[in-house]
Swiss-Prot record:
It comes from the Bacteria. It catalyses: 3-(3-hydroxyphenyl)propanoate + NADH + O2 + H(+) = 3-(2,3-dihydroxyphenyl)propanoate + NAD(+) + H2O; (2E)-3-(3-hydroxyphenyl)prop-2-enoate + NADH + O2 + H(+) = (2E)-3-(2,3-dihydroxyphenyl)prop-2-enoate + NAD(+) + H2O. Catalyzes the insertion of one atom of molecular oxygen into position 2 of the phenyl ring of 3-(3-hydroxyphenyl)propionate (3-HPP) and hydroxycinnamic acid (3HCI). Keywords: Aromatic hydrocarbons catabolism, FAD, Flavoprotein, NAD, Oxidoreductase. FAD binds at residues 17-46, 285-295. Pathway: Aromatic compound metabolism; 3-phenylpropanoate degradation. InterPro entries: 3-HPP/3HCI_hydroxylase (IPR023786), FAD-bd (IPR002938), FAD/NAD-bd_sf (IPR036188), PheA/TfdB_FAD_monoxygenase (IPR050631). Belongs to the PheA/TfdB FAD monooxygenase family. The gene is mhpA. This is 3-(3-hydroxy-phenyl)propionate/3-hydroxycinnamic acid hydroxylase. Pfam families: FAD_binding_3. Its EC number is 1.14.13.127.
Length: 554
């Protein structure tokens, strides 16, 4: 697809493997991951600096695991508040739904508050670790065109200078109003909510109560959220007939804050901004050499804090696949699995967010009365209460097709789900999270067994070329048993007993884990070779001997 550009000779040229449009969180995460894989990356951003106005405030365990994968989680954690509960209140202040999960199966608290601009700054600083990654601010993407083997981008600087970029791939992380998506005429299906919300951030939190509260007041629903670094966020629905300009007037802002504070005059306003909530999904995530990610691919209301986290899932899913393709280790058909795996889950998160918004502000007043009564009764049913407390209603990502091999019934299979991340003990006695022992790699993880036993020499060579780590998990008391050591295998102790429980529950002894920590396949030692051949095929790995049939029999 060719897009014409004004006939102006470009002054500067950049030639890279991946161009990323947008220096938001998804673009910066893509840049960090690809950077550590040695990919030559250029990030182009229209603004002159990172956005610092009110944005996302919730980061989940999956997103923190993604931060961990690029070595930034320790710098991110100081800007978070772990175990951040969400409570729905009636107009009289009674809590009718409490979302307070205390599980950490992926290594991190499931719900966390955070300050997005500070975390974005951590990611921007993170790319400076890689000489192969550059970020150019004050660059407007004016046009682009696709050829058989590259994408050409035409940029304009703030001074009006023209630049041209040649890239093998373009990843569009340029937001809900994505220029790239609109230029490609990709339908952005969904709707825009009729009501807007004004967001107010206040320093030196005048309430200082923990957690986040959603008050379902039919007169004016509002949100009160405790954020890190003593910041309080209030969100108020903008009612019909009101405008942002009116609400910004001191007397009207005072009236809004008097709803939640005893002294609305004694506050330190950081900033305020009006938002419109959209629920939209791109029809396609890949268009030849262009891939859409984050808000460019899907946008959703804020009520479950999943817009940011869904973007992190996009980046984690796409980055390792793109790296394999660029490195020549897989054919570009692997990139088709990005949409296949991510689009359905993004749709599920949009639906959940819309539902949560309808709980907070039902379209009809009688629906709010019904909600309060039903929720009060359901709280007396322990299974229902646990369902909300433990956040079981959140659709966990599960892929039914794509870069995976499933054997048996999909409903009970762990394949296509994220693998757990417990603590493990290393042979030197150190205790660490599982991902830290594996790195940003594939892993073949075996309970008690040597994971190399079921593989041919050719398969070992093939999977090692991908950077695969071979892990043998043993009970912690066996970690120093010398006769169980195998060359090229990392032995770890099951510190918490969680890995033993996982393998027992799923009736498998071997797991093939992808770099994004999803289970690509399960096996036993006698079937591992056959399973790896199938996986190599569906992932379109490029080694010519990937289709050799190997299966050991005792």
């Amino acid at each position: 697809m060719a897009i014409q550009h004004p006939d102006i000779q470009p002054a500067v040229n950049h030639s890279v493997q991946v161009a990323i449009a947008g220096a938001g969180p998804v673009g910066l995460m893509m840049a960090n991951y690809l950077g550590q894989m040695g990919i030559d990356v250029l990030v182009v951003e229209k603004l002159d600096k990172l956005i610092d106005y009110p944005r996302a405030i919730g980061i989940d365990d999956e997103a923190l695991r993604t931060m961990q994968s690029v070595g930034l989680v320790d710098d991110v954690l100081p800007h978070t508040t772990p175990w951040h509960a969400m409570r729905f209140l009636t107009p009289k202040g009674r809590c009718f739904a409490d979302i307070q999960p205390m599980t950490d199966e992926f290594g991190w608290p499931r719900r966390n508050a955070f300050i997005q601009p500070q975390v974005d700054a951590v990611m921007l600083e993170g790319v400076s670790r890689f000489p192969n990654v550059r970020c150019l601010f004050s660059r407007e993407l004016e046009a682009f065109s696709q050829q058989d083997d590259e994408v050409t981008l035409h940029l304009k600087t703030a001074e009006g200078q023209r630049e041209i970029v040649k890239a093998q791939w373009l990843v569009a992380c340029d937001g809900g109003a994505s220029f790239v998506r609109r230029t490609l005429n990709v339908p952005f299906e969904g709707k825009t909510a009729p009501n807007q919300w004004i967001v107010v951030d206040i320093a030196n939190d005048p309430l200082s109560t923990p957690h986040i509260y959603l008050c379902c007041d039919p007169v004016r629903p509002y949100v009160s959220a405790a954020l890190p670094h003593a910041v309080r966020r209030f969100e108020f629905m903008v009612m019909p007939g009101e405008t942002e300009e009116q609400l910004r007037e001191p007397q009207n802002m005072r009236k809004l804050l008097s709803k939640v504070l005893p002294n609305p005059d004694n506050v330190e306003l950081i900033r305020q901004r009006v938002y419109t909530h959209n629920a939209r999904l791109a029809q396609r995530f890949r268009i030849d050499r262009v891939l859409l990610a984050g808000d460019a691919a899907h946008i959703m209301p804020v009520w479950q804090g999943q817009g940011y986290n869904s973007g992190m899932r996009d980046a984690f899913n796409l980055a390792w696949k793109l790296a394999l393709v660029i490195q020549g280790k897989a054919r570009d058909a692997l990139l088709d699995t990005y949409q296949q795996e991510r689009r359905d889950h993004a749709k599920a998160m949009i639906d959940l967010s819309v539902t949560a918004g309808n709980v907070l502000a039902p379209p009809k007043r009688w629906q709010g009365t019904l909600r309060d009564g039903v929720s009060w009764l359901l709280n007396y049913l322990p299974p229902v209460k646990r369902y909300f407390l433990e956040m079981r209603f959140k659709p966990m990502p599960q892929y039914y097709g794509g870069a995976l091999v499933r054997e048996g019934e999909a409903k009970h299979s762990p394949v296509g789900k994220m693998f757990i991340q417990p603590k493990v003990t290393l042979e030197n006695g150190d205790v660490t999270l599982l991902d830290n022992a594996i790195g940003a790699n594939f892993a073949v993880i075996g309970w008690g067994c040597n994971p190399l036993w079921g593989m041919s020499d050719e398969q070992i060579q093939q999977w090692r070329a991908l950077g695969t780590r071979f892990i043998q998990v043993v009970p912690e008391v066996q970690i120093h048993t010398a006769q169980d050591n195998h060359d090229g295998v990392l032995r770890v102790g099951d510190t918490q007993g969680r890995l033993r429980s996982w393998f027992a529950q799923h009736n498998a002894s071997l797991v093939v884990m992808r770099p994004d920590r999803f289970v690509a396949a399960t096996a036993i030692p006698q079937t591992l070779g056959k399973t790896l051949n199938k996986l190599a095929s569906v992932m379109t790995l490029t080694r010519p001997d990937a289709d050799v049939s190997v299966e050991k029999v005792a």
